[in-house]
């Protein structure tokens, strides 16, 4: 019974970032994305939910790997801060349409992600490396966000 509870907890840990991302996306209207001017090399709208789903799952897996033996409070706090910043970006960009503020928010997310990766690396190198696609995607998002600022 104890192992069953642990397995359920581990599954929740892995999928929690994905669920959070889905819930935060329900708060906004993505139709705005279709009407704003976007920079060159902007991915098609359909790419975003696919990419974010993969990245959120990798985030959950990293968190699980780093905490599977014991909970590391630094990793936990870094993860929570990062996800709060991440989820709030969606609201700031799409709902509030505050593109400059959302770009600043992205810089904070990138810095938070670097801190998260450093904390993960101390505990589990694989967990840290799983976050590099997330970091790269955040840099792409910053490029897109700045492009939206310039073009709109």
Question: Which residues does each PLM region occupy?
Answer:
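Membrane-interface loop-to-helix entry segments
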Residues: 45-57, 97-108
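Alpha-helical transmembrane segments of multi-pass membrane proteins
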Residues: 17-32
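Core segments of transmembrane alpha-helices
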Residues: 52-63, 82-85, 109
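Membrane-interface helix termini and inter-helical loops of multi-pass transporters
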Residues: 29-42, 151
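Terminal transmembrane helical module of multi-pass membrane proteins
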Residues: 126-152
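Membrane-interface helix caps and helix-loop-helix hairpins in membrane proteins
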Residues: 91-101, 148-152
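Membrane-interface helix-boundary motifs at transmembrane edges
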Residues: 2-6, 65-75, 120-129
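Alpha-helical transmembrane segments
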Residues: 9-21, 81-84
């Amino acid at each position: 019974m104890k192992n069953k509870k642990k397995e359920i907890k581990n599954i929740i840990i892995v999928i929690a970032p994905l669920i959070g991302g889905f819930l935060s996306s329900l708060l906004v209207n993505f139709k705005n994305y279709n009407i704003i001017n976007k920079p060159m090399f902007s991915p098609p709208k359909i790419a975003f939910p696919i990419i974010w789903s993969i990245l959120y799952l990798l985030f959950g897996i990293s968190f699980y790997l780093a905490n599977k033996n014991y909970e590391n409070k630094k990793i936990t706090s870094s993860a929570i801060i990062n996800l709060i910043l991440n989820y709030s970006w969606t609201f700031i960009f799409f709902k509030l349409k505050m593109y400059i503020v959302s770009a600043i928010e992205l810089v904070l997310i990138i810095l938070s992600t670097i801190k998260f990766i450093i904390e993960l690396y101390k505990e589990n190198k694989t967990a840290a490396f799983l976050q590099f696609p997330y970091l790269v995607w955040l840099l792409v998002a910053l490029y897109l966000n700045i492009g939206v600022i310039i073009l709109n």
